[in-house]
């Protein structure tokens, strides 16, 4: 899963890509091609 600042380009990669909001974060999911999954936001620091 990619972590991106903006999902604008991620949602246009494939016609089956959808934007879903879960737990206050935006996700792009693609059931036909799962390699296009993405989430908007920053990685958590350890």
Swiss-Prot record:
InterPro entries the record matches: Ribosomal_bL36 (IPR000473), Ribosomal_bL36_sp (IPR035977), Ribosomal_L36_bact (IPR047621)
Molecular functions (GO terms): structural constituent of ribosome
Keywords: Ribonucleoprotein, Ribosomal protein
Disulphide-bonded residues: none
Pfam families membership: Ribosomal_L36 (PF00444)
GO cellular component: ribonucleoprotein complex; ribosome
A Gene Ontology BP annotation from the UniProt entry: translation
Family: Belongs to the bacterial ribosomal protein bL36 family.
Protein name per UniProt: Large ribosomal subunit protein bL36
The organism of origin for this protein: Citrobacter koseri (strain ATCC BAA-895 / CDC 4225-83 / SGSC4696)
């Amino acid at each position: 899963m990619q972590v991106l600042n903006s999902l604008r380009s991620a949602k246009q990669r494939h016609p089956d890509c959808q934007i879903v909001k879960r737990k206050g974060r935006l996700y792009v999911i693609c059931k036909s091609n799962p390699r296009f999954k993405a989430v908007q936001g920053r990685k958590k620091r350890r």
